[in-house]
Amino acid sequence: MLCVNVELQERRYPILIGSGLLQDERSYPIKRGDRVMIVTNPTVAQFYLDTVIYALEKRGCVVDHVLLPDGEKYKTLESLNLIFTALLQGNHGRDTTIIALGGGVIGDVAGFAAASYQRGVRLIQIPTTLLSQVDSSVGGKTAVNHELGKNMIGAFYQPSMVIIDTLTLNTLPKREVNAGLAEVIKYGAILDYEFFEWLEQHIDELVALHPEALQHCISRCCQIKADVVARDETEKGDRALLNLGHTFGHAIETHLGYGNWLHGEAVSTGMMMAAALSEELGDISIADVSRLEKLLARANLPTVSPDTMQPEDYLPHMMRDKKVLSGKLRLVLLKSLGQAYVANDTEHTLVLNAIRRCTQTD
């Protein structure tokens, strides 16, 4: 087992990474008599809910659970209210612990519930997808979507622990594995050139879920994110760099309808658009753009815009991005592979040109 610590100004919390952690009662920092509410969905529940309940009950915990509908389109206030109703009907107090057992949607909604219920209860994240293991479960971002924009309603709320059991990836559909690799590649592209080179050498092993490669990959991604979050917990500076490709990607998700493209798929194409714009601005070489494209393609990820979107469809969505300040578009771009920066008020004509370069042609 590996442990990565997230060091915040006022406290720290561990990320445990290993195989078989869910069934090990020692993984859970919960004492006899504690009350727990597990938030999950039917897809995850069929594989792991009984395992987690059994481990917690061996510790003497009182365990309830609530099932949310499965999918990005259910990352809503309605799903949030299902959690509140279950907590209230079960007479859960401020001393309860919410466990988010699932992928990014479950983690975000359950995390927001933990931040909100009785003004805050303890949260444990148990991510079961590659994307949530390397990204969304770490760092305290919680949110639900609005029909006009992704992650528009939420809070920063840190978990007390993250438990990453790599065995959960064995039941993950290949498309979900590939989507998670988009966020993995992002870390190398923005902050760690050596890791990017390692990914070029080992991406095939990751696609095939080789255990040693996976454990190294997940721990490296978590360490990179932990370091960034330690410097900038609430995204006032460096943490914005973690959003490479996300402004373009969120536009795709919102325009197509949540869930039609997976988040990682949209981020993949978004990274290509950001790289194309970086090259237009003279920051990155065409050779490095090509390296990024080839790596994403080897991970079976899209690198061009959906054929149902036109370049002009992007900007209205992008202007509602949370990084927009005073009506000016701010984008995460690349100075080189392994070095990102935030560009302020980039000309819209250049943005459109970059999108056009990543548009499908017959």
Swiss-Prot record:
| Molecular-function annotations in GO | 3-dehydroquinate synthase activity; metal ion binding; nucleotide binding
One Gene Ontology term from the biological process aspect of the record: amino acid biosynthetic process
| A Pfam family per the record | DHQS_C
Q: Which family does it belong to?
A: Belongs to the sugar phosphate cyclases superfamily. Dehydroquinate synthase family.
Top-level taxon in the UniProt lineage: Bacteria
Q: What species does this protein belong to?
A: Haemophilus influenzae (strain ATCC 51907 / DSM 11121 / KW20 / Rd)
Q: What is this protein called?
A: 3-dehydroquinate synthase
Needed cofactors, names only, are: NAD(+); Co(2+); Zn(2+)
Pathway field of the UniProt record reads: Metabolic intermediate biosynthesis; chorismate biosynthesis; chorismate from D-erythrose 4-phosphate and phosphoenolpyruvate: step 2/7
Q: Which lineage ranks, top first, belong to the organism behind this chain?
A: Bacteria, Pseudomonadati, Pseudomonadota, Gammaproteobacteria, Pasteurellales
Q: Tell me which CDD domains the record gives.
A: DHQS
Per UniProt, the keywords (alphabetical) are: Amino-acid biosynthesis, Aromatic amino acid biosynthesis, Cobalt, Cytoplasm, Lyase, Metal-binding, NAD, Nucleotide-binding, Zinc
- Which Enzyme Commission number(s) are listed? 4.2.3.4
